[in-house]
Curated annotation (Swiss-Prot):
InterPro entries: Gln_gamma-glutamylTfrase_bac (IPR020916)
GO BP field: sporulation resulting in formation of a cellular spore
Entry keyword Protein biosynthesis: no
Family membership: Belongs to the bacillus TGase family.
Organism domain of life: Bacteria
Molecular function terms, GO-annotated: protein-glutamine gamma-glutamyltransferase activity
Name assigned to this protein: Protein-glutamine gamma-glutamyltransferase
Encoding gene, per UniProt annotation: tgl
Catalytic reaction list: L-glutaminyl-[protein] + L-lysyl-[protein] = [protein]-L-lysyl-N(6)-5-L-glutamyl-[protein] + NH4(+)
EC number: 2.3.2.13
Keyword terms of this UniProt record: Acyltransferase, Sporulation, Transferase
Transmembrane residue ranges: none
HAMAP family: Tgl (MF_00727)
Pfam families: TGL (PF20085)
Length: 276
């Protein structure tokens, strides 16, 4: 269900020739048909969320095709022209290097980088926002970047919730409870849901849910009897907060609305929204 202000609406793309129009319409249809409530104050916020999701998906595919390597933190490496490898295996932005250039280099020269899956997901989030922000804004927000697992910049606002409906552009986690300790890095897989039943995970590539579970199951202890599984934990960029920094020059998606109800009372507690 999609709510704009106090109105429950069914949105649709009005310009079928705009970039990724079909993908955007699919996302809107999924959100409108889900039981979960997606609440926005304005249509511009919905447009930002929609474009953010598309950019997360395209950034995930770009990273997949970049040659970016899968490595444990003990074996991680980065381009020393832009980053310093920390003692824990993270990547620390060098002084006087704009974060926008350093993030773009990961996608341009992926073979010069290697790390594990959680860091890869955060890199994808930064790249998606870079596509929607002025470079000056991005550099101001994310100065002194450190890329290391979930230690992301305080100005990157994320929402993690349990339960809810899966939407393309969501980050979801596969858990492998009986992983072989010799390959503990396969205790789970962070992935971006690409839509059409496909996920991207750094290390497994672009695969279906069943294929990712199979890959994780291959890395269990001998005689394991518990299968890997897709958890119900979903992580998203808080598009309502992050939309404040969007570039005025970023093209807006033209969205029309079929009104369903215009007197909804919306209440949000934590990350749960209810409509009365």
């Amino acid at each position: 269900m999609i709510v704009i202000g106090r109105s429950i609406v069914h949105p649709y793309i009005t310009n079928e020739y705009e970039p990724f129009a079909a993908e955007k319409q699919q996302i809107l249809s999924i959100m409108a048909g889900n039981q979960e409530i997606y609440s926005f104050r304005t249509s511009d916020e919905l447009s930002f969320d929609l474009n953010l999701r598309v950019n997360i998906i395209t950034s995930a595919l770009e990273l997949f095709q970049s040659g970016f390597q899968f490595r444990t933190f003990q074996q991680s490496f980065c381009n020393p022209q832009y980053w310093k490898r920390t003692s824990l295996g993270g990547f620390e932005l060098l002084p006087n290097i704009p974060p926008s250039i350093a993030i773009q280099d990961i996608f341009k020269n992926g073979k010069l980088y290697g790390t594990e899956c959680a860091t890869a997901m955060i890199i994808i989030f930064y790249k998606a926002l870079l596509s929607l922000y002025e470079k000056e804004t991005f550099n101001r927000l994310f100065a002194n970047l450190l890329l290391y697992t979930w230690d992301y910049d305080q100005d990157l606002k994320l929402i993690t919730k349990t339960g809810g409906d899966l939407v393309p552009g969501d980050l979801v986690y596969f858990k492998n409870p009986q992983v072989n300790p010799a390959t503990i890095e396969w205790q789970g897989e962070n992935t971006i849901y690409l839509g059409n039943f496909f996920f991207y995970g750094h290390g497994v590539g672009v695969k279906t849910k069943e294929e990712i579970i199979y890959a994780l199951n291959e890395r269990r202890v001998p005689y394991a009897f518990i299968s890997a599984f897709l958890t119900d934990t979903i992580t998203r960029i808080d598009s309502r907060l992050m939309s404040y920094h969007a570039s005025p020059s970023t093209p807006q998606t033209s969205i029309g609305f079929i009104p369903i109800r215009d007197d909804a009372i919306v209440a949000t507690v934590g990350n749960t929204t209810t409509v009365y």
